Regions:
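Conserved catalytic-core segment of clan PA serine endopeptidases
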Residues: 26-40, 74, 80-137
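Protease-domain processing segments flanking chymotrypsin-fold serine proteases, especially trypsin-like
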Residues: 2-4, 10, 20-61, 169-171, ...
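Short beta->alpha transition motifs characteristic of CBS
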Residues: 69-72, 212-221
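Catalytic nucleophile loop of clan PA
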Residues: 59-60, 191-215
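Short, solvent-exposed secondary-structure boundary/capping segments
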Residues: 118, 185-189
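Extracellular/periplasmic catalytic domains that process cell-envelope and extracellular macromolecules
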Residues: 38-41, 60-61, 81-83, 121-125, ...
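Catalytic histidine site
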Residues: 41-88
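Active-site substrate-binding loop(s) of clan PA
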Residues: 59, 76-78, 110-122, 132-165
Length: 250
């Protein structure tokens, strides 16, 4: 089973987030990045292979650091956190090959993440993790992504992800919308599925793609499929502190 849990938004959330008049009409179609030309600029997104437990999506934000969803670090059946060495980041994976393969040396979930929470909003909050690779990835064609400020309602974002039935190459949805949000969760019109957990959400300005959020879950609002994402601003500093503490404790 791919690590992306499905949930329905509860009345409490929809009461906070104004969805009236939201439209999916302007969303771009999902496009598969099957060639090196298609993937140029996006090879920092990779498949995160979780041993024999499936996969998630991750994104390089430094030569040795990968962002993903916190729930990807846990065995779905037992709830036990995977050992870092069980996880492999396959950067720019497409058509059976990656540009770089790296095992994971350390993995930290956001301290506020609660994997034991029931499916619902409590499980989305702080669903973000930071992985330290065993060796940095230093390739001219594979540059880490910058990060940026949290998007607001009405902003246009993009998502690059792997997923069930499209696991052989990443796909990009170049335009989807931020329907609504609060400081710990965003509702997006972006299309995601099992395996998309941890996928980076980008804002592209002046030709520069910056990661602003991480995909956590898929959901439905009034019969429309949506995705839930965790804002990155603030969370990243907390993750970096947790990773530093992990190094000191090892």
């Amino acid at each position: 089973m791919r690590h992306l849990f499905t949930l329905a938004l509860m009345g409490a959330m929809t009461g906070v987030l104004a969805l009236a008049g939201a439209s999916w009409a302007d969303d771009a179609e999902m496009v598969s990045l099957e060639s090196s030309a298609d993937s140029r600029g996006w090879d920092g997104v990779g498949k995160l292979v979780l041993g024999d437990r499936g996969f998630c999506t991750g994104a390089l934000i430094a030569p040795n650091l990968v962002l993903t969803a916190a729930h990807c670090l846990y065995d779905k059946t037992t709830g036990v956190q995977l050992r870092p060495e069980e996880i492999e980041f396959q950067a720019g994976f497409r058509n059976g090959r990656a540009l770089a393969y790296r095992s994971v040396a350390r993995a930290v979930a956001h301290p506020d993440y609660r994997n034991a929470a029931e499916d619902g909003l409590d499980r989305v909050i702080a669903d973000v993790a930071l992985l330290e690779l065993s060796q940095p990835i230093r390739l001219p064609s594979l540059q880490p992504f910058e990060t940026g400020a949290v998007p607001v309602e009405g902003d246009v974002v993009a998502v690059v992800s792997y997923a069930q039935y499209r696991e052989e190459a990443p796909s990009i949805q170049e335009t989807c919308d931020v329907l609504a949000g609060r400081e710990d969760a965003l509702i997006l019109t972006c299309s995601v599925d099992f395996g998309s957990s941890g996928a980076p959400v980008f804002v592209v300005r002046d030709g520069v793609a910056r990661i602003v959020s991480v995909i956590s879950a898929k959901a439905e609002v009034d019969g429309h499929k949506v995705s839930l994402a965790v804002p990155l601003a603030g969370a990243l500093a907390t993750l970096e502190e947790a990773l530093a503490a992990s190094r000191q404790g090892s």
